[in-house]
Structure formats: structure tokens, C-alpha cells
């Protein structure tokens, strides 16, 4: 499956909620979802009742779009989660949350996960003192994440927006030195991603 290259705002309208894919634009009046909060297309306003399969598929698509993960990789996360200990759905979300690009976003160094992904890909992030340019790199408790270029305009914009926002309890942030630490894996109640993970589990288990 190729990476989606169309307008991000169409994805928000398709899912019927803001996915916060465009940074500051999502918080402004310019957000297309504010003006057209219905599915894209000529007949976007029509409400169709989804089948059980449709509901599960929709939930999977929503999670993939929020985290910016393609189908092949998303399925691999599910397979890992289903083989591990604990609740499969919660474990799936933990794998997604501990991706390096997501942690960079959660630490407030990027306005969106896509922007965080670019920071990682361009070599602006180090893990335990070593530069890492793989957005999907999964962090574990005790790992230290460091921002190597503090003066980038996108980083400064993110800090101005999220500067006073508390980071999730499973992360620790040293704002002065631009370092973060993974304290532990996140609990389900600490993950604010608007998805029903059980529907995703049911989709892949059918």
C-alpha cells in the first residue's frame, strides 16, 4: 500500500473527527473540518449505516491515519501485540505510542506526528546518545530521547503552542535541556487517542 499523498484534511472529514494532522491549522478557524464536518465527495452529507465489518474497518483506518502507519506495518504491530502478554488492544496502542515519532510529538517538539516523523528522518533526534533516523523505532522504559537542533523554526513553533502543556505521565521532560525519558509503558487510560481498539482486534481476528 502506497503512502497517502492527498490533502490531510480530507482524512479528518472521512473519519468524522479532527485527527490533528496539520499542526496549528487544526486549532484555527481555517481548519476545513470546522466548515465542512462531513465526509468528502459530492454526497458527503449522506449518512449511511455501517455494517459491523464497516465499523471495524473504519476504526482500523482511523488508528492508522492518526499514527501515520501503513497497513503492512500496522498488521505487524497487531501480530506482535497478539502474541505478547496482556490485553491485545492495549498492547497494540502501547506499540504505537512508543514509536519514536509519536514520543517526539508527545514531548511537544512537533505540532503533528507527521512533523515529528520529519524531525526523526532528518536526523534531528538522538536516543541514548546516538542519532536515530527511523520514525518507527520503538522505545522502551529507560530510553532517553534528545532533540539535537533546538533552533529549528518548526520546533520553536511547537514549543510556543505546547510549551506549558503537561506531557503524559509515562514520559518525563527536561524542558531546559530538550531531553525526554520513557518512564514506563503507557496505561490505557493515559492514551487519549480516540479509537476503540477492541474493534481493531475484532477486525483482524475475524
Curated annotation (Swiss-Prot):
InterPro entries from the UniProt entry: Ribosomal_uS4, Ribosomal_uS4_bac-type, Ribosomal_uS4_CS, Ribosomal_uS4_N, S4_RNA-bd, S4_RNA-bd_sf
HAMAP family the UniProt entry points to: Ribosomal_uS4_B
Protein family (similarity comment): Belongs to the universal ribosomal protein uS4 family.
GO MF entries: rRNA binding; structural constituent of ribosome
Summary of the function given for this chain in its UniProt record: One of the primary rRNA binding proteins, it binds directly to 16S rRNA where it nucleates assembly of the body of the 30S subunit.
Domain S4 RNA-binding stretches: 98-155
GO CC terms of this entry: small ribosomal subunit
Lineage: Bacteria, Pseudomonadati, Dictyoglomota, Dictyoglomia, Dictyoglomales
Superkingdom in the source lineage: Bacteria
Keywords per UniProt: Ribonucleoprotein, Ribosomal protein, RNA-binding, rRNA-binding
rRNA-binding is among the record's keywords: yes
Pfam families (alphabetical): Ribosomal_S4, S4
UniProt source species: Dictyoglomus thermophilum (strain ATCC 35947 / DSM 3960 / H-6-12)
Protein's UniProt keywords contain Zinc: no
SMART domains according to UniProt: Ribosomal_S4 (SM01390), S4 (SM00363)
Subunit structure and binding partners: Part of the 30S ribosomal subunit. Contacts protein S5. The interaction surface between S4 and S5 is involved in control of translational fidelity.
Gene Ontology process terms (BP): ribosomal small subunit biogenesis; translation
This protein's name: Small ribosomal subunit protein uS4
Amino acid at each position: 500500500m502506497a503512502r497517502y499523498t492527498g490533502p490531510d484534511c480530507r482524512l479528518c472529514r472521512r473519519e468524522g473527527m479532527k485527527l490533528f494532522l496539520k499542526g496549528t491549522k487544526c486549532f484555527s478557524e481555517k481548519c476545513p473540518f470546522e466548515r465542512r464536518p462531513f465526509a468528502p465527495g459530492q454526497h458527503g452529507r449522506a449518512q449511511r449505516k455501517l455494517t459491523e465489518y464497516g465499523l471495524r474497518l473504519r476504526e482500523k483506518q482511523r488508528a492508522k491515519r492518526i499514527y501515520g502507519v501503513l497497513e503492512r506495518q500496522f498488521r505487524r504491530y497487531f501480530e506482535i501485540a497478539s502474541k505478547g502478554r496482556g490485553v491485545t488492544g492495549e498492547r497494540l496502542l502501547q506499540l504505537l505510542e512508543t514509536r519514536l515519532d509519536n514520543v517526539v510529538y508527545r514531548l511537544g517538539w512537533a505540532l503533528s506526528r507527521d512533523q515529528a516523523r520529519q524531525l526523526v528522518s532528518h536526523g534531528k533526534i538522538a536516543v541514548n546518545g546516538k542519532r536515530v533516523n527511523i520514525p518507527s523505532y520503538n522505545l522502551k522504559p529507560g530510553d532517553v530521547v534528545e532533540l539535537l537542533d533546538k533552533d529549528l523554526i518548526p520546533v520553536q513553533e511547537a514549543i510556543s503552542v505546547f510549551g506549558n502543556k503537561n506531557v503524559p505521565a509515562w514520559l518525563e521532560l527536561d524542558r531546559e535541556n530538550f531531553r525526554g525519558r520513557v518512564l514506563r509503558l503507557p496505561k490505557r487510560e493515559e492514551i487519549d487517542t480516540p479509537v476503540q481498539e477492541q474493534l481493531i482486534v475484532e477486525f483482524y481476528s475475524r
